[in-house]
Amino acid sequence: MHIVLYRPEIPYNTGNIIRLCANVGAELHLIRPLGFELTEAKLRRASLDYSDLTVVTEHENLEDYVKKYPERICYATSARSRRYYSDIKFGSNDSYLFGPESSGIPPAVLDTIPRERHLLIPMKPGNRSLNIANSVSIIAYAVSYTHLTLPTTPYV
C-alpha cells in the first residue's frame, strides 16, 4: 500500500501519518512543495521514532510519481466523489492520494485520475471534511483488513 500526500501543509498531520504507515506496512510518498521541512521538530515529535520503520519518499510532482510507478492503480480521495471507499476492491500495491489540508486535491489534479477511482469517505451532511490523518487512517485500515495478516492474539 502506498499513501501519497499531495503538497501536505501541516507537519503534525504528516508525522501522525508516518506512524500510521509504519504500523500498517505502507510506504509514504510526499509530493512537493511541502509546507514544512522534513527535519522540523513538529514532524519528528508527531512521528516519534516511527520514521525509521517506514519508507518516506519525496517526489517533485505528481506526474513524476505516476511515471515512476505506472503499474500502481492510483485512487484519489475527494469530498466531491460519489463512490464510497468501501465499494472498491483494494489492492495491496495500490496508491491512495490525499490532498492538502486546506483545500483537498485540486480539480485539475483530480481530473487526471479516472472518475471511477475517486473515493468518498462518508460523513455527516453539512460537514466539510475530516482531518487528513484521520482520512488516511480510514483508508489504510480498510486496505489492511483486506491484505494484512492480523495477529492471532491481541498485543497486550
Regions found by a protein language model. Name each.
Residues 3-24:
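N-terminal beta1-alpha1 ligand-phosphate binding loop
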Residues 26-27, 73:
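Residues at the starts of beta-strands that form the adenosine-phosphate
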Residues 105-118:
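Acidic-glycine-rich active-site phosphate/pyrophosphate-binding loop
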Residues 40-107:
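S-adenosyl-L-methionine/SAH cofactor-binding core of RNA-modifying enzymes
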Residues 9-13, 129-134:
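Amphipathic alpha-helical repeat scaffolds
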Residues 28-33:
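Short internal beta-strands
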